[in-house]
Amino acid sequence: MKKRIKELTDLLNRYRYDYYTKDAPSVSDSDYDKLYRELVTLEQSYPEYVLQDSPTQQVGGTILKGFEKYRHQYPLFSLQDAFSREELDAFDKRVKAEFPNATYLAELKIDGLSISLSYENGFLQVGATRGDGNIGENITENIKKIKDIPHQLSEPLTITVRGEAYMSRQSFKAINEARQENGETEFANPRNAAAGTLRQLDTSVVAKRQLATFLYQEASPTARNQQNEVLAELADLGFSVNPYYQLTSSMDEIWDFIKTIEAKRDQLAYDIDGVVIKVNSLAMQEELGFTVKAPRWAIAYKFPAEEKEAEILSVDWTVGRTGVVTPTANLTPVQLAGTTVSRATLHNVDYIAEKDIRIGDTVIVYKAGDIIPAVLNVVMSKRNQQEVMLIPKLCPSCGSELVHFEDEVALRCINPLCPSLIQRSLEHFASRDAMNITGLGPAIVEKLFLAGFVHDVADIYQLTKEDFMQLDGIKEKSADKLLAAIEASKSNSAEKLLFGLGIRHIGSKVSRLILEVYGDISALLTAKEEEIARIDGLGSTIAQSLTQYFEQKTAAILVDELKTAGVNMHYSGQKVNSDAALFGLTVVLTGKLNQLNRNEAKDKLEALGAKVTGSVSKKTDLVIAGSDAGSKLEKAKSLGIRIEDEDWLRKL
């Protein structure tokens, strides 16, 4: 029986691969079902012989208690967006300045959810969401319910791969029809449906919804030399790989490919929102490296957004957490990119003046980045007698006089006691990318603020069960969950806290970079502006904003209150000391390394405090030259830059 179970498992997995990966079924559905039922019967009789990669392990489901956080061994970066041919040409110029012979691989940008899959000795161990790029959620049990993801690879590799999980248009239509019949709210679009599916606690729901994937990257070190070779290897290993891509050195050919794909976009079985262009050589990718947010070797061209006409009925003015007052237009409802849109941002007062936008105007509405509804311009031919829009002089929340700084496009409320400003700051502090206090959303924050229970973020950690129970609609169970979420947030790594403070110009990635150096929030109270500016990826604007914030007496008081409440002040990741051997130095790796691979060398340099870049310039402090080093070594010599070899690096 053991042998027959193994035969059936291998046979059914091969049929599944032919169907889902090759899109070439090699057996009829009835024959497949007959073999499948035989395997189910045998496994029920001999459970000790059930194999880890059995197709039966993808059927049915369990109820999960929740999703654990998962720290990615290899961070997931965002991509730089482009919306024009000129931006693509600028990208090409930057790349060709370093590598004149560079070729590109253009791939479809699938409108789905980024996933990371880790295998050990060929077996799937972890499936995770992207999260913030460093920490995602472990959704392995749900990932196993996606039929085209292999539980076992065709080779016993230890590897981490990346891709997109998506829902086909056909599956999306069927699911929404079923939800409509059951009186349930329909999903807005396939991407939202896929996102909701992957976060289901009932894995049987995931199995029924028929998600699919396209894999496109080996995140772990690979023996391949080119991106197109990576795609071929992924397909050989049993993954689904998108068949549409273009390999070329010509941006003209890339542009032709983009236009061809855009023309057939509606004919595809799944949603796409653009084309990703990557430098094909993995060695060149390593040399080009990354900015704080994105790789320098790739760019994502986004298709132009769908546009519709709508009438502006009125305008709301709201105060954000930094005091910026944002105008939002209330519109006659229109269908846009799969959703009903009745509100759209007008950005700021300068934008309103530039476009001469007035209440009652017919305007062109689109979704910026296919996400945020915005007003593009006015249809002047349909204007009647609309009057110029009145711009508020007083804050809509606190009544304080608004200011319009010369170097800014927005109106701003500068009253630190403005109720809206405080509430938005509290919401930001509790948000997922900051302290991630589950359940503490805008509605509850507003109730807490109006009840007088919270005035700053430190007050959150003084809340009691009785406080929550006094709020309308909060029962004992909800109060317990909120208190548990608040307590859990105390143990977050310090970069979450720093981001949560809402300091201007200090985003989540910048927060991590700062804490990698300083290690503790308390150390920022005495940090020097020039020291902060030296950190790789930052600069004077960020350094000035950070030091100005922590120079305030209120900042020291707030940090002390948070510390007293038990909120963690320490960075839990790898810290780079300011006295590290290469702290603050800009270093370039060039040539072939014989004892370290390039990733190992880069990791060591960064651990020693260096900024590793891909090109030699006057700003370069040090070049590590391996064998066969070429033009970069010559340029370093001509500029008088210090040069060391691999042995020197290994001894550090």
Swiss-Prot record:
Positions with a binding annotation for Zn(2+): 395, 398, 413, 418
Binding annotation for NAD(+): 29-33, 78-79, 107, 130, 164, 278, 302
CDD domains (UniProt xref): BRCT_DNA_ligase_like, LIGANc
Domain BRCT: 577-652
Cofactors that this protein relies on: Mg(2+); Mn(2+)
Domain of life: Bacteria
GO CC terms: cytosol
Active site per the UniProt annotation: 109 (n6-amp-lysine intermediate)
Record key words, sorted: DNA damage, DNA repair, DNA replication, Ligase, Magnesium, Manganese, Metal-binding, NAD, Zinc
Entry's family note: Belongs to the NAD-dependent DNA ligase family. LigA subfamily.
Primary role: DNA ligase that catalyzes the formation of phosphodiester linkages between 5'-phosphoryl and 3'-hydroxyl groups in double-stranded DNA using NAD as a coenzyme and as the energy source for the reaction. It is essential for DNA replication and repair of damaged DNA.
PANTHER family: CHROMOSOME TRANSMISSION FIDELITY FACTOR 18 (PTHR23389), DNA LIGASE (PTHR23389:SF9)
Protein name: DNA ligase
